[in-house]
């Protein structure tokens, strides 16, 4: 049951999410020492991901 990532559907979904969040993820890594900015961006990213998941579902 741990092989979810190996299924085509999961891979394609993960790929879409990665494409959408790619810029955000890069910003998070670059600005990691800046806690305030990191948290602000993290909250925004999570909101977008939550909305996206509802649409996909």
Swiss-Prot record:
Additional record remark: Is not encoded in all strains, and seems to be dispensable for replication.
GO CC annotation: host cell cytosol; host cell nucleus; membrane
Name listed for the protein in its UniProt record: Protein PB1-F2
Underlying gene: PB1
Source organism per UniProt: Influenza A virus (strain A/Gull/Minnesota/945/1980 H13N6)
Region of interest (Disordered), residue spans: 1-37
Subcellular location: Host nucleus; Host cytoplasm, Host cytosol
Transmembrane domains' residue ranges: none
Its job: May play an important role in promoting lung pathology in both primary viral infection and secondary bacterial infection.
Similarity annotation: Belongs to the influenza viruses PB1-F2 family.
Ranges of compositional bias, category Basic and acidic residues: 16-37
This protein's UniProt keywords: Host cytoplasm, Host nucleus
């Amino acid at each position: 049951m741990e092989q979810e990532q190996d299924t085509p559907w999961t891979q394609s979904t993960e790929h879409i999410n990665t494409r959408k969040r790619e810029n955000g993820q890069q910003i998070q890594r670059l600005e990691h020492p800046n806690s305030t900015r990191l948290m602000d961006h993290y909250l925004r990213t999570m909101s977008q991901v939550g909305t996206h998941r509802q649409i996909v579902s």
